[in-house]
Amino acid sequence: MTHELISRTGRVQNWMDNPEGRLPVSCTVYVVEDSMDEGRDSIENSWRFVSHALRYGAGVAVHLSKLRPKGSENGKGLTASGPVSFGKIYSTLNETLRRGGVYKNGACVLHLDINHPDILEFITTPRHELPWVKRCVNLTTEMWDDTSDALRESLLYGIKSGDIWLNKIKHDNNGKRIYGNVCLEVYLPSRGTCLLQHVNLGACDIREIPTAFYSGMSELCDLHGRTGVGESGEYLPPATDRQVGLGMLGLANLLRRYKVTYEEFGYALEKLNMDAIDTTLGEAKNIALQFKMGVDAAANVARSHNMDRAFAIAPTASCSYRSTDVDGYTATPEIAPPIGRKVDRDSGTFGVEPYDYGDVEIASEVGWDAYKKVADQIMIMLQNTGLLHGYSFNSWSDVVAYDNAFVEEWLASPQTSLYYSLQVMGDTQNKTNVYAALDESSVKDYLADILNTQPQPDCNCQE
């Protein structure tokens, strides 16, 4: 592990060490057109694209909303089988293909808009029928308002059970739709790709924060044109595909070192975003000021390289495990407080390894409101640059109530996604405990459905 100011993703570092059979981009998307074999973005070509992405180390999001609903006819005597039927093919591809021929931990996520006629089937399909893909529902406030109560109920249950993620529909500055990636922190055009890396806030002194942001963005922008991703013909070339994704990890470590709570930091960020600095906030104010200086410096670098989007807060578990803070403790993932101060990482690929975050504030001490204020205010700061992708925003299943009001509050917030539902009141961080929000009888029914199926892939942009 290292306490460097910049934490590279495994994909970038592995590509630098050995570019053979892999690419440094973390993610890509493919928008499937409603044709079996006609056109570059046909259904059949999507299979080749997904195969290419997984074999070269990129997680791939497949957007299926343009496909005709199940049972509809095309006027030529052909009847559509619907998006879910093709989802089973992508699941099998992900199960079978080894990323770069080394680790079997690729990621594939299927996306469908909430107003697609087959959305209920998409939400309620049993996990054993789609065991190697995750499912994400794309929506806007207007779409949610037009959604029936029955569909809302099914969607909320899917969120509680961990089977369904949410992503806001987003358009670029020219009004063209861009599409959520595997882990929901990046928005791309079809066949676009994104490089990711992270500022290790835990390795920074306060005055080093701007330098870390500047250096991290400079390295990403320099690497952007040298990846060779467009040479295969599958991905868009860097000359036209203009985005990178600089995120951050180790925030809890940084706050611990300067004895600042999440509540204090959130308040300082809020005041700064309103151009109202509170001089009584001490180190919380200083961290917030340096944080904004870093974001502004990184944004200027991205603009000088003509990037369309440049900030993305990814789920950095794997990357954080390889990074340490100034005092030698493991850097905490992304910007959220960890669930416990120590964690055993149980990975089917890498086995069980223990990690110690030090005496950081943990989620149960921070509280949902204080954490959400920090997350919202950071998103507002990044939004103000005009270069934001998004944030893989986890909810806390044993704290929040998954109901209409929760979704409506999320839609009105600066958050762009609703990712995993995590239990935070225990001491074990385990994203596989997807039934955390269910009652006992529901858990029994749920487990009966999945007990004998293959495990879900770890959908992590760094692994």
Name each model-derived stretch:
Residues 1-463:
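Long, C-terminal-biased catalytic regions of enzyme "large/alpha" subunits
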